Swiss-Prot record:
Its main location: plastid. InterPro entries: Ribosomal_uS4, Ribosomal_uS4_bac-type, Ribosomal_uS4_CS, Ribosomal_uS4_N, S4_RNA-bd, S4_RNA-bd_sf. GO terms for biological process: ribosomal small subunit biogenesis; translation. The gene is rps4. GO terms for molecular function: rRNA binding; structural constituent of ribosome. It comes from Lotus japonicus. This is Small ribosomal subunit protein uS4c. Belongs to the universal ribosomal protein uS4 family. The lineage of its organism: Eukaryota, Viridiplantae, Streptophyta, Embryophyta, Tracheophyta. Transmembrane segments: none annotated. Residues 89-150 form the S4 RNA-binding domain. It comes from the Eukaryota. It is found in: Plastid, Chloroplast. GO terms for cellular component: chloroplast; small ribosomal subunit.
Length: 201
């Protein structure tokens, strides 16, 4: 299944806020309708929608998400927590959380078009897994800096997660540590996602 490229508001109306996909928020009316419908949903539907929230927020294909679930399942610790850490430490998501891109699709475009350095080297793979002490900077040219500056200026004034440090005037971000689960940028029950895939096999 390919990455979703359709109407974004349609997805947030059904699944709730997906800040990685779009800065738009569902209306109060649609949230109330979703709450009233939730009492009628089957357990399968609930697990499916949690999985879809994760996939659309992080901009993944079905195959990519399944791959992350399998990697998380082989790691030590809670599969759900490890899954969220893997997704949050992707380069495209780090750029988004720093405010250097307005959405994850925009961050992916910055990376694909080679506007971003990691530790002084161009990285053009959005799924690159960032690690503690990685330094992320804009390419040293006017176009790259302008694109990132526009995002920084339009980013909502939210508290930066503790695993990241931003130096906006230098177009630079630092990864301090692996993300703590309480700072994950999406309201999600990750255990339902793991359950969804465990029942597919």
């Amino acid at each position: 299944m390919s990455r979703y490229r359709g109407p974004r508001f349609k997805k947030i109306r059904r699944l709730g806020a997906l800040p990685g996909l779009t800065s738009k928020r569902p209306t109060v009316g649609s949230e109330l309708r979703n709450q009233s419908r939730s009492t009628k949903k089957s357990q399968y539907r609930i697990r499916l929608e949690e999985k879809q929230k994760l996939r659309f927020h992080y901009g993944l294909t079905e195959r990519q998400l399944l791959k992350y679930v399998r990697i998380a399942g082989k790691a030590k610790g809670s599969t759900g927590q490890v899954l969220l850490q893997l997704l949050e430490m992707r380069l495209d998501n780090i750029l988004f959380r720093l405010g250097m891109a307005s959405t994850i699709p925009q961050a992916r475009q910055l990376v694909n078009h080679r506007h971003v350095f990691v530790n002084g080297h161009i990285v053009d793979i959005p799924s690159y897994r960032c690690k503690p002490q990685d330094i992320i900077t804009a390419k040293d040219n006017k176009k790259s800096k302008t694109l990132i500056q526009n995002s920084l200026e339009s980013a909502p004034r939210e508290e930066l997660p503790t695993h990241l440090t931003l130096q906006p005037f230098q177009y630079k971000g630092l990864v301090n540590q692996i993300i703590d689960s309480k700072w994950v940028g999406l309201k999600i029950n990750e255990l339902l996602v793991v359950e969804y895939y465990s029942r597919q096999t």
